[in-house]
Design a protein with these regions (language model features):
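Gly/Gly-Pro-rich "capping" loops immediately C-terminal to redox-active cysteine motifs
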Residues: 56-123, 141-170
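Surface-exposed patches in mature extracellular/periplasmic domains of secreted proteins
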Residues: 139-144, 206-211
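Juxtamembrane interface at the cytosolic side of transmembrane helices
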Residues: 209-239
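Electrostatic cytochrome c docking/interface patches
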Residues: 18-42, 53-64, 72, 202, ...
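Extended, hydrophilic extramembrane loops/domains of integral membrane proteins
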Residues: 159, 163-203
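The canonical Cys-X-X-Cys-His
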Residues: 44-55, 194
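Sec-dependent N-terminal signal peptides
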Residues: 4-13
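Soluble non-cytosolic domains of exported or imported proteins
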Residues: 31-38, 42, 117-125, 181-188
Length: 239
């Protein structure tokens, strides 16, 4: 609980980190699409968890995505053999500081941290754009830069899927120089699925909360009608 409160305290600092001036695209995904969430979980485990952890999420929570315990153990668990374990990164923080200069942030609530009070869902849009905006930059230590987050220390972990983009300095737009294993539309869909998982992970009960909210509103509406009818019946003899 102490670590979780600290993460919430520092989340706004992550949101205000150095960002570029690129146009932020609208995330086309949804947390109600179980197939997208399952694919996003697979991408997260295979690509993101090499450096980033999700230390406030347990592997058993992935069962809520419609996966069986066997599927989770066989396809999504590489750093632990217990489904009740937290989704921690295998590398130690001191090793990561040595490699990257700073330990990569935990991603459990990154989708919420990247939003803001005026647009809490904006974190999904930012992540969707950021993960598609890496380009080759020989002046950076990793060989990569990002149109959304200038001089970011993170390399392009998905370049095998997307390929290698370069900056056209005349148009200030990115162009695909070396194709990846996925077509551009397929890559965009994969990133959307990954963001779906990140959004779900930041608040796993959001779909239940929304559904429950509609039931509560419906109950209050019925209660209002009953209360109004009772009020009229009670006061008719007085008036």
């Amino acid at each position: 609980m102490k670590k979780f409160l600290i993460a919430l305290l520092f989340a706004p600092l992550v949101a205000f980190a150095n960002t570029g001036t690129a146009h932020i695209d609208k995330w086309p995904g949804s947390v109600s699409d179980k197939a997208a969430l399952q694919n996003g979980a697979k991408l997260f485990v295979n690509y993101c968890m090499n450096c980033h952890g999700a230390s406030y999420m347990r592997y058993k929570n992935l069962l809520d995505l419609g996966l069986t315990e066997q599927q989770v153990k066989e396809n999504l668990m590489f750093t632990s053999d217990k489904i009740g374990e937290l989704m921690r990164v295998a590398a130690r923080s001191d090793e990561q500081k040595l490699w990257f200069g700073a330990a990569p942030p935990d991603l459990t609530i990154i989708a919420r941290a990247r939003g803001d009070a005026g647009n809490p869902a904006g974190g999904a849009d930012w992540l969707y754009t950021y993960l598609r905006s890496f380009y080759r930059d020989a002046n950076r230590p990793t060989g990569w830069n990002n149109l959304v987050f200038e001089n970011v220390g993170m390399p392009h972990i998905l370049y095998g899927l997307q390929g290698q983009q370069v900056m056209n300095h005349e148009t200030h737009k990115l162009e695909l120089a070396v194709p990846g294993s996925l077509a551009p539309a397929e890559f965009d869909k994969s990133v959307s699925d990954l963001v779906s998982f990140l959004v779900w992970m930041a608040e796993p009960q959001q779909e239940y909360r929304r559904t429950l909210g509609w039931f509560v509103l419906a109950f209050l509406a019925v209660l209002f009608v009953v209360a109004y009818a009772l009020k009229k019946e009670y006061w008719k003899d007085i008036h």
